[in-house]
Amino acid sequence: MLSYNRFRGYLIPQIHALKLFRYASTASTSGEKIESSERPYDVGMLLRPKTKFEIKTYKPISPGLRHLKRPVSDYLWKGKPFRPLTVAKRKKGGRNETGRITVRHQGGGHKQRIRLVDFERKVPGVHRVIRIEYDPGRSGHIALVEKLNSETANKSYILACDGLREGDTVESFRSLLKTGSNGEPVEMDPVLAAEIEDGTFAAKNLKPGNCFPLRLIPIGTVIHAIGVNPNQKAKLCRSAGSSARIIAFDGKYAIVRLQSGEERKILDTSFATIGVVSNIYWQHRQLGKAGRSRWLGIRPTVRGTAMNPCDHPHGGGGGKSIGNKPSQSPWGVLAKGGYKTRRGKNVNKLLVRDRPRGKEKR
C-alpha cells in the first residue's frame, strides 16, 4: 500500500498535468511552465482526506441508544453561535393567523435561533474560516468567516462545503463579472480576460468554498449553492451532501446537471460555489427514538386507517380495511397518480432534460 508521502508525490504532478478547465492553458500545451508566485492549486485542500464514512453508534444501555446512529463531526464548534448573526424563531405549531392547523405534524421542539446565512456572497476579498458550526435549521453545516485585512472585520455565516475546516480561506469572485441594467455582462479588464482565456485564473483560484460566476467555472466542475438569476441569492443545491455539475455552455446559458438527473439552463452570469455541501453522510442518521423527533419539532403521523370516518376517508370500518376506494389524502386528493403538478408540456422553457421517473435510469 502506498504511503501518504509517496501518494502525495505521485498525485501532485498528475493534478498539474490534467486539463480540468474550460480553456486549456497555452503554457501547458507548449511545454512551458506557468510563472506564478503562488502554487496553481491549493494542495492542502486537494490532498486532504475527504470526510470518512464514520457513523457513531452507542452502547445499548437503553432502547433509545440501541438504534441511535449519527455521522461523526468532531470538527464542529462546541459553543454557542455568533449571536449578532441570529434572530429568535417564533414557532406557530403549524397554525395560521386564525388558529387553524395548515401544516400537519409540526409543534413543540427545542428552542432555536435562526442563523442568518449569506447566500449572496457579494463581499469580495479573502475570508478566513473562524469555525464550523451546527445549524438546527438545515441539514448541512455552516461556517463563520471573517474578512482579512479589513478595518470593520465583518463576520458572516456561509454554507460550509465538504472538507472546509477552521483556518482555511475562501473568496468570492462575483464582483469580477460586472453586469449592466439589462443583465448583460460589460467589458472586463483585459489582463483578467487573458488569464481567464488561457486557464491560469482557474488554476490559481479554483478551490472548494470559492464563489464564481458560472461563466468563469470550467466544464465538469462540481458546484453547489447555485443562483438561478444573477441578482438573487443561491437557491439550488443547499442541503447536506447535495451538488450539481456543469456539463456544457450554450450561448449565454450554462447547462447544469442536478443530482436528480435533471438538466437545465442557467444564465452564465449567475453564480455558484465550488464543491459539495458539508455533512454528506447526514442521510444515514437514525434518531433512535420518537422523543428525538419531538425535540426537532416533528409531531406523530397518524395513519388514516386508524382514524374515524369523520377525520379521514380511510377511517372507520371493521378491521384495517379502507374499503373499496383508492388511496387518498385527508382532503380526497388521490395518492397514486390522481394529482398532477404540471398542467401542460414545456412549462419550463429552460429545462433541457427532465429528471428520470419510474424505472428510468439517470
From Swiss-Prot:
GO terms for biological process: mitochondrial translation. Component of the mitochondrial large ribosomal subunit (mt-LSU). Mature yeast 74S mitochondrial ribosomes consist of a small (37S) and a large (54S) subunit. The 37S small subunit contains a 15S ribosomal RNA (15S mt-rRNA) and at least 32 different proteins. The 54S large subunit contains a 21S rRNA (21S mt-rRNA) and at least 45 different proteins. uL2m has a Na/K ligand binding site. InterPro entries: NA-bd_OB-fold, Rib_uL2_dom2, Ribosomal_uL2, Ribosomal_uL2_bac/org-type, Ribosomal_uL2_C, Ribosomal_uL2_CS, Ribosomal_uL2_dom3, Ribosomal_uL2_RNA-bd_dom. The keyword Ribosomal protein applies. Belongs to the universal ribosomal protein uL2 family. Residues 306-362 are annotated as: Disordered. It holds the Pfam family Ribosomal_L2_C. Component of the mitochondrial ribosome (mitoribosome), a dedicated translation machinery responsible for the synthesis of mitochondrial genome-encoded proteins, including at least some of the essential transmembrane subunits of the mitochondrial respiratory chain. The mitoribosomes are attached to the mitochondrial inner membrane and translation products are cotranslationally integrated into the membrane. It comes from the Eukaryota. This is Large ribosomal subunit protein uL2m. Residues 351-362 have a biased composition (Basic and acidic residues). It comes from Schizosaccharomyces pombe (strain 972 / ATCC 24843). Signal peptide: none annotated. It is found in: Mitochondrion. GO terms for cellular component: mitochondrial large ribosomal subunit. GO terms for molecular function: RNA binding; structural constituent of ribosome; transferase activity. Residues 1-23 form a transit peptide. Keywords: Mitochondrion, Ribonucleoprotein, Ribosomal protein, Transit peptide. Its main location: mitochondrion.
